[in-house]
Amino acid sequence: MKMLTRLQVLTLALFSKGFLLSLGDHNFLRREIKIEGDLVLGGLFPIKEKGTGTEECGRINEDRGIQRLEAMLFAIDEINKDDYLLPGVKLGVHILDTCSRDTYALEQSLEFVRASLTKVDEAEYMCPDGSYAIQENIPLLIAGVIGGSYSSVSIQVANLLRLFQIPQISYASTSAKLSDKSRYDYFARTVPPDFYQAKAMAEILRFFNWTYVSTVASEGDYGETGIEAFEQEARLRNICIATAEKVGRSNIRKSYDSVIRELLQKPNARVVVLFMRSDDSRELIAAASRANASFTWVASDGWGAQESIIKGSEHVAYGAITLELASQPVRQFDRYFQSLNPYNNHRNPWFRDFWEQKFQCSLQNKRNHRRVCDKHLAIDSSNYEQESKIMFVVNAVYAMAHALHKMQRTLCPNTTKLCDAMKILDGKKLYKDYLLKINFTAPFNPNKDADSIVKFDTFGDGMGRYNVFNFQNVGGKYSYLKVGHWAETLSLDVNSIHWSRNSVPTSQCSDPCAPNEMKNMQPGDVCCWICIPCESYEYLADEFTCMDCGPGQWPTADLTGCYDLPEDYIRWEDAWAIGPVTIACLGFMCTCMVITVFIKHNNTPLVKASGRELCYILLFGVGLSYCMTFFFIAKPSPVICALRRLGLGSSFAICYSALLTKTNCIARIFDGVKNGAQRPKFISPSSQVFICLGLILVQIVMVSVWLILEAPGTRRYTLAEKRETVILKCNVKDSSMLISLTYDVILVILCTVYAFKTRKCPENFNEAKFIGFTMYTTCIIWLAFLPIFYVTSSDYRVQTTTMCISVSLSGFVVLGCLFAPKVHIILFQPQKNVVTHRLHLNRFSVSGTGTTYSQSSASMYVPTVCNGREVLDSTTSSL
């Protein structure tokens, strides 16, 4: 049944194209190379290019055709001379032309299966006596096939050869389809599949940030599957396809000129990715030259490093990036090929045509009106460059030879010749047990490293290694320069790349955003965006997102992250500090001077009469208020913050408790004199001190409880409108600080009330009058301070300075209104600081260890009558 299936397939194939390829047609003129051997390898090469119109074949393909064909012959010669590889076994060849067409290649490949059919049905050729009939044109039995070149050719041929279990090794077919072992189970290749190349091309685009490109593919398996693999890799890297074009020979496809026009419709897609056969690439570049179009081409190995593709259109291809399979030139082949000429190469029937085409001459007189070829013409370095896949052709032939060698050693261990077990090859065994398992160092490779190993993976594919070339103009000469390589990862020498406009081209749907802008992607298109500036306090988390650094942080110069802003606070050298500190120092010195004067003249009548105990307490409070400036200017810390909260209210409490005690005493004394009451209680100096300390203690207790409930500390504070500034402040609200002064306000109000009540005392009693001046002025200062404090809350410098100056002014008011007159008399009018006469009090006298209101001390200057009662003034009438 199996034999009938093969016969039916072969018969259908033969008759579908007529009898030109049948066994009995002797009129069909076929160009082929047949060299007999013990084992014969088939060969398929694009010796000629595609024909135009109705012609099957066109001009000679000098590089990919003739060179590759001769590479196979060269490899066969070397193997046959090798004493270690297949010794005693001669390899033969049967080489056919594919004309760069898959259908034509399939017709040619039928020759390879004729021998298999003959062996299968050999009984039909036996004579009645048991002998075999004499046959003409007996086909050679093919052990394996080397080829084809184009993926479309290899796919068609592989579908045929698998039916007859003939192994096939391609040296150039890279379509990913051929890795499918369920369909191409006798196919192997010394080159990698296209998805490696597609990945390399996508990485090149990503490397240069080309995210918006056009693509052009050749019709057929190579171009279509290759560009499909590229599109998958591009999507993974957020690369968008502006337009995808396809070219081919069929009438439904666009012409090359129309493809160029379509590409020009996408002006932002300056990079064009080509996955095309060499002939299609040449035509497209020529069309671009006609349209004077300028693109940056990124091309697959279909273009590679071929001079023929860009010939005549070099200016259009300038700056192109092309890929070629990584290979080493076979120098022995160079010597072999350069030794060939039409007079010594008779086994190659296409060589004469190649010679005439290459040198534009004729080997026969008056042929095509060409000049006669000079017999001294030769192939040399001036007119020859080794084609890039010669190494892969040689490796393919050697791979088949190594597999046959191991099979022969296994099946025929006692001989170097072919034994009966190999007379009819088991192609399945050869492929699976030997070919896929070969592992040898590439012949003629000077580098004995990992890259020189020839082996196949489980899919029969070669290793993925590519060279990256740049087409450039150096010194007026165009050439390809290797600028990198790809072997799972990309490596490029960017400095060696020449661009058509002397700078790396851009190929993006939208212009690049500024360093401080993010991309706002357009719906449905990951490559087109609108640039939106980030706020000054935002950094770029990625190219699509601006992220808030958060309070207290600021983006770095390159917007890649954030850093902690330095803490801002008033420093001693700031102008905002110098003014308040100067005022506070002046006030503190004045306070110290007053204290010094009072201590020095402590026992003089004026000091005694002033209530010196309360005066010292009052002066201590004034001095403490000046010290508060230093606490508010100092860098905030838990200790400083505690001192601020404790000292501000306490300093005022000390001052106004002393004043309240004094005004209350005066008021009670005059009320007692006025009403004729008994001597008021608690008017002795010690009583007044205890009353004053009690009032102060209330404030201290309140602040202490506050400190316990809300522990002092610092916080980093940022205003919404000034995010770039981080203010180091105490962790207490401004409102809380003012609330803590509530008790002091009560003291001020009470002092003011008592000062107002004693305003009608005799005019010679000036103590009450000056206390009144002090309290009125203090109220004015505080009424002006409160709104200023709240209005300046947005600027901590102004607020702090206002606070310091207001506190200092309160101290100056006390010094100026209460103590300045006394100091003036003590220092400049000492004659008034004496006892001038005695005032007798009928109702009561006040006495104590310190200040005395009694008959012994009532002989002060000027007796005073208040509402008909005589009282003692604690100051003098001339103040």
Curated annotation (Swiss-Prot):
Keywords: Cell membrane, Disulfide bond, G-protein coupled receptor, Glycoprotein, Membrane, Receptor, Signal, Transducer, Transmembrane, Transmembrane helix. It is found in: Cell membrane. Disulfide bonds join C57-C99, C240-C527, C361-C373, C412-C419, C509-C528, C513-C531, C534-C546, C549-C562. Glycans are attached at N209, N292, N414, N439. It is a multi-pass membrane protein. The keyword Glycoprotein applies. The keyword Magnesium does not apply. Residues 599-613, 710-735, 791-807 are cytoplasmic. It holds the Pfam family ANF_receptor. L-glutamate binds at S151, A172, S173, T174, Y222, D301, K389. PROSITE patterns: G_PROTEIN_RECEP_F3_1 (PS00979), G_PROTEIN_RECEP_F3_2 (PS00980), G_PROTEIN_RECEP_F3_3 (PS00981), G_PROTEIN_RECEP_F3_4 (PS50259). Residues 25-577, 635-688, 757-769, 829-879 are extracellular. Its main location: membrane. GO terms for molecular function: G protein-coupled receptor activity; glutamate receptor activity. It comes from the Eukaryota. The chain crosses the membrane at residues 578-598, 614-634, 689-709, 736-756, 770-790, 808-828. GO terms for cellular component: plasma membrane. Residues 1-24 form the signal peptide. Belongs to the G-protein coupled receptor 3 family. G-protein coupled receptor for glutamate. Ligand binding causes a conformation change that triggers signaling via guanine nucleotide-binding proteins (G proteins) and modulates the activity of down-stream effectors. Signaling inhibits adenylate cyclase activity. This is Metabotropic glutamate receptor 3. It comes from Macaca fascicularis (Crab-eating macaque).
